[in-house]
Amino acid sequence: MKVDVLLGLQWGDEGKGKVVDVLTPSYDVVARFQGGPNAGHTLEFEGKKYILRSIPSGIFQGGKINIIGNGVVLDPLLFREEAEALAASGYDIRKQLRISKKAHLIMPTHRILDQANEAAKGTGKIGTTGKGIGPTYTDKISRNGLRVGDILHDFEKKYAEAKRRHENMLRAMNYGYNMADLEKPWFEALEYLKQFELIDSEHEINEYLTEGKSVLAEGAQGTMLDIDFGSYPFVTSSNTVCAGCCTGLGISPRNVGEVYGIFKAYCTRVGSGPFPTELKDETGEEMCQRGCEFGSVTGRKRRCGWIDLVALRYAMMINGVSRLIMMKSDVLDTFDTIKACVTYQIDGKEVTRFPFEVTETSTTPIYTELPGWKTDMTTMKSEDEFPEEFNAYLSFLEEELGVPIKIVSVGPDREQTIIRYTE
C-alpha cells in the first residue's frame, strides 16, 4: 500500500479538515505530518461544529487510527483543551490516537518568544498567531528542542536548560512576561499527555503499509505558506508541501500514492503578505461574509480575492497533485461574473510562472471572466444538478490546470460534498 496525501494549495484555510473527515472511511489510518496549533481544521456534521488544531481530522470516524507525526509541534496545554473538548462531546480519543515521540514540544517560553519577536518587528510584522510555532521550529533546527519522548526520562533537567536559554533571550530583548500563569497548567498538561500512546511513529506507519493498511497523510496550512516555496518571509515555519509528508512521517517518497490538492473556488489569505488577486472592495467583502472568512483559531478576518491560477499551477507542480478538490463553491452563488487570474503582468511583461518575489505594486493580475451561475448550490446532492455555468467553470479550471476536480464542496457540512469521477 501507499500513503495518499491531502494538502492545501493556497494560503491555508482551504477546508482540509472537512475533506479528511469525508475521505477517512476509505482509510485505516490518518496521520498529521506538520504544523502546530496555529491553524484549525473545521468540521461540521449533525448540527455541530468542531475545530481541531493538533488532532488529526479522522478522529470522528470510529475505529480509525489517528497519528500525530514527528513533523508536528505540539503544545500540551492546547492539546489537552482540544482532547477534553472532544471528550465532552462524547469522543474519547485515547484508544484511537497515537503521538510520535519525535514530535517537538511547544514550551510556554516559545509562546512568549513568538510574541516578543513579532513585537520587535514593528511595522514589519509577518502576522504570526503567537502560538510559539516559529521559536519551536527554530529550536528544532538548532538542535535545542524538547521532544515528546523526552517527557519519559530526565525531563526536568532538559526543560530547565531550555527555559534558561529562552529567558536569556527575552532579557536581551527587554520583553516583560509572567511565567507563573503559564508553567503550572503546562506541566499538568504534560501529565495528561502521558495517558496517550507515545510511539515511534515512523516504524508504526511503515508497518501498517507492509500489512496492507491504507494511510491518509493530512497537511496543515497551505503550499503558499511553505517555508521554502511560499511567499517568504510571510510563511509558516514548516514544509507544508508533499515532500513534508516524507520527513514529517518517516516514509519513503516511493510510498507516496495519490496527492489530493485542495483549493477554494476563490482565494483567501490571513495576516500579512502578498496577495495578487485581493479585492479591497464590496466584492471582496461579500466573499468574506458569505464564506464566513474568519480564522478558526485566531478569529482574524481573512482577505479575499478571485482564484489565482498562476499560484495554483505553481502549487500543483511542486506537490505533484493527481486529484483536485474544490471547496466553497457555494460562496460564489450570488455573483453575476466570476473572474480567474490566468497570468500576471510584471514590469509590462506577461508572466505565467509564479515569480521569486510578488508585491502589490509590481504584480497586476490578468483575468478571464466567466458567467456566474446565480443558483443556490447548497442543497445539491449530485453533479447532475450543477447549473450549466458552474459546469463551464469546472471545465475551464480543469483545462487550465490539467488535473480532474474529483470532489466539489457546496457547503460546510459533511453531507454537502459531491464526489465526481467515481471509479
Model-based region annotation:
Residues 1-423:
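Non-transmembrane, aqueous-exposed alpha-helical and coiled segments at domain scale
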